[in-house]
């Protein structure tokens, strides 16, 4: 099986639909010899910040000498970045080899009358099998959706259950209220593991703490108020947090204060469990961490930022970052959103301060809110100084935004936001401009 054939096979699986619960992936993993049972996990759930916490934590562990697997969703640059070891993506040949083994297992299951796994279940099984074959010391694992019934939650050997910020998202899918969403996500806590959480709303905190205590888990909450910022701009910050002094980080944005404090508390929890993680590894890991689509700077003149803010909480933090870093600059937004998100709130938070807004269709045609409908939503809250354009393509939006940003000596910043799903195309389209300004 070639890589192309493996991707085609995976794409074809989406037509089979899905069966709720973990029985299907358990059956697949059993057919593969339960590779997840030979691995140790740091399992991360949350609404916003999971990816950044994963990036910091896994890079620090790699710098400390632990062979560290990463499983992330969604991806930004390449499909292959979904499965990584020490920051290196799985290769096309490795992907094809693992997929062939999984296809054979699925064929055997289907012959027994078992259901076909979902795409995400197959990807998760691939990751477990790959990490076992590569003999990873630890795997930092990001949930796909929710927690308790998420395909990643088949694992048993959770060393640390981690919660990034939990807020309202995927209403009606994993819960109808914030409390129900938090309860679902708390399902990743396993008996006796350590639990680390971001600073949560009080009702969420009570749910997580109660679940942790019921399973005899030590519960630790990050304290972002103990972080002192020494230097900061749109390219990163220098900070101190508790005993970690003068640390450098190259992912900017308001939300990174919270994410950094969570990651450092995870590292402290692991140290208490006997993992050898020196301060130098923490320093080197933070300095080396890059995470595409999280307030990522593509250009400095003009400033071009891509950020995956896709819900109300993320939009508020993006707005705070914009106000902090770009006071006095004209704001140009490129925006694409999914129609099943609370996009009106994203628009109401971000768009009133913009000079121009270019709306686009997302690559996923089934879920995208059409650019024209998004433009209509923007017009409902536009000011007299704002212009709104529904573009035919992401490339057109990038070209027009960049041209306007550079047409005279005015200070302007371009921000592409609304979803992670189209940022790879923004990055690709922008490359020709920023390489030859």
What are these regions (language model features)?
Residues 1-46, 53-66, 71-73, 107-114:
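Short functional linear segments
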């Amino acid at each position: 099986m070639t890589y192309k054939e493996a991707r085609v096979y995976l794409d074809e699986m989406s037509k089979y639909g899905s069966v709720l619960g973990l029985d299907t992936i358990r059956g697949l993993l059993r057919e593969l010899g339960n590779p997840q049972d030979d691995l140790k996990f740091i399992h991360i759930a949350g609404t916003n910040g999971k990816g950044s916490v994963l990036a910091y934590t896994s890079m620090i562990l790699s710098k400390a000498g632990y062979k560290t697997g990463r499983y992330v969703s969604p991806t930004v640059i390449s499909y292959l970045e979904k499965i990584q070891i020490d920051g290196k993506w799985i290769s096309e040949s490795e992907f094809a080899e693992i997929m062939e083994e999984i296809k054979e297992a699925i064929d055997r299951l289907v012959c027994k009358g078992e259901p076909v796994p979902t795409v995400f279940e197959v990807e998760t099984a691939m990751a477990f099998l790959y990490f076992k074959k590569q003999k990873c010391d630890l795997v930092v694992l990001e949930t796909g959706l929710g927690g308790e019934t998420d395909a990643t939650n088949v694992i048993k050997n959770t060393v640390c259950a981690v919660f990034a910020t939990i807020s309202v998202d995927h209403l009606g899918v994993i819960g109808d209220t914030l409390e129900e969403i938090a309860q679902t996500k708390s399902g990743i806590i396993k008996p006796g593991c350590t639990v680390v959480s971001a600073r949560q709303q009080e009702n969420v905190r009570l749910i997580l703490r109660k679940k942790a205590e019921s399973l005899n888990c030590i519960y630790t909450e990050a304290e972002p108020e103990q972080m002192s910022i020494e230097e900061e701009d749109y390219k990163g910050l220098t900070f101190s947090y508790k005993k970690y002094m003068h640390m450098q980080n190259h992912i900017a944005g308001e939300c990174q204060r919270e994410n950094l404090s969570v990651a450092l508390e995870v590292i402290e929890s692991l140290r208490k469990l006997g993992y050898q993680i020196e301060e130098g590894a923490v320093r080197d890991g933070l300095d080396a961490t890059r995470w595409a689509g999280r307030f990522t700077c593509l250009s400095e003149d003009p400033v071009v930022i891509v950020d995956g803010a896709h819900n109300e909480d993320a939009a508020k933090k993006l707005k705070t970052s914009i106000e902090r870093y770009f006071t006095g600059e004209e704001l140009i937004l490129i925006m694409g959103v999914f129609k099943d998100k609370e996009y009106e709130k994203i628009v109401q938070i971000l768009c009133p301060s913009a000079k121009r807004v270019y709306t686009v269709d997302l690559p996923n045609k089934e879920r995208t809110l059409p650019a024209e409908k998004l433009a209509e939503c923007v017009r409902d809250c536009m000011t007299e100084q704002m212009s709104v354009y529904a573009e035919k393509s992401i490339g057109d939006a990038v070209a027009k935004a960049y041209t306007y940003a550079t047409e005279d000596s005015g200070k302007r910043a371009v921000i592409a936001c609304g979803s992670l799903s189209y940022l790879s195309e923004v990055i690709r389209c922008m490359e020709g401009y920023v390489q030859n300004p």
